[in-house]
Design a protein with these regions (language model features):
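Metal-cofactor-binding active-site regions of metalloenzymes
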Residues: 1-129
Length: 129
């Protein structure tokens, strides 16, 4: 039997180390930035994807971690955290992921005054949907 992308898609999978703030849809980043008045390095989806992608030569750890500044900038409200958690769960489900361990640092989402408990509750609510 030849292993095809369709077969792989149907196989049950486990995602054991998934960073919430590294799993946003490009369209969602742009929409949340518009809603929240956040300035992005580009409003064009193709350009933003290039900016956020690692590519073949990842560069330094500092370069890699710096990309999270962009996603974190739009994850400072309960609504945005709930939305991206929900979208992550949906995307994983569509990819055949049946077990998902999501990680994030709640304190990185408190820059605009959100409480730590709000960050946790929002992510839990999004994942539970």
């Amino acid at each position: 039997m030849k292993l095809t992308s369709e077969i792989i898609q149907r196989l049950p999978k486990a995602e054991l180390h998934c960073h919430l703030d590294g799993s946003l849809r490009i369209k969602t980043i742009i929409e949340l930035a518009q809603i929240q008045g956040v300035e992005l390095p580009s409003k064009d989806a193709t350009d933003l994807l290039k900016i956020l992608s690692i590519g073949d030569s990842p560069g330094s750890l500092e370069d890699y971690i710096g990309k999270f500044d962009i996603t974190l900038s739009v994850l400072q409200t309960p609504e945005s955290l709930e939305r991206v958690a929900f979208e992550l769960a949906m995307d994983c489900h569509e990819d055949g992921v049946r077990y998902l361990e999501v990680r994030y640092s709640p304190i990185l989402h408190t820059k605009n005054g959100m409480k730590l408990s709000e960050t946790v509750d929002s992510v839990k609510k999004g994942l539970a949907q």
